Amino acid sequence: MLKWTSNTFKDILELKDGPVTYSDSGRGNLKMSNHPYPYSIKEEEFNFLRNLIVEHNLQRGYECATAFGISSTALGLGFKETGGKIVTMDAYIEESKGNPGHYRDMQREVYDKADGYKSVKYLIEQFGLENTLFPEIGWSPDDTETCIRRHFSEPLDFVFIDAGHFPEQMIKDIDAFLPLLGEKYVLAFHDVYPQSFSEAVHTTCLKRLARKLRLNFHIHLVKI
């Protein structure tokens, strides 16, 4: 069984006996060798997310979206250390369509034969996360609460959003998890570009969280 080290990201790249193999995108991300998309988070982000969970002793998390389980594994390793649990959900449309923006105008659709789902299940086995990381196939916002409640009923204290990089989807994702949050929590958003984390998203956060977010780098945190 693999364990977390400072080289875990590279260890994943070298795995060759699973349902998929992994390759470097050339930009510091990993990808499944037989698919153009999706891309994973980068190594420094992987370690950052794992350490974030441990440093704050977080217990119940939700990730949207899984992709093929690299960020999920980072989070799972953190929650394994704290004794917590995390649900990760994806519809796997980016993989099935080979296009990260294809589902912008789609209605609810899920792809239940995804290599990404097979990949995250494989990584769970490799890192001994069977009691920590729970992958679900679902569409945000429609299936968010149902998928989370299959695994725990207590409030969330962590959410990581790395799904549709366009304002209307980010607002839907935020509205889906807000009712499930506890009093204190940490939120993390990936790829917070101006065109995706727009003024409309800022306004939504201001109304729902009573604060406007200040963004920097690629992962933005909200700690409450």
Named regions from a protein language model:
Residues I12, G18, S25, T132, ...:
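Short linear motifs in intrinsically disordered/low-complexity regions
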Residues M1-E14:
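N-terminal auxiliary segments of SAM/dcSAM-dependent transferases
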Residues H35, F46-I224:
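S-adenosylmethionine/decaboxylated-SAM
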Residues K3, K16, K31-S33, F152, ...:
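Generic detection of intrinsically disordered/low-complexity segments and helix-coil linkers/edges
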Residues L13-H56:
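Class I SAM-dependent methyltransferase Rossmann-like catalytic core
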Residues T8-D11, G26, C205:
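Terminal low-complexity, poorly structured segments
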Residues M1, K16-S23, R208, L213:
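Short, flexible helical or helix-coil boundary motifs
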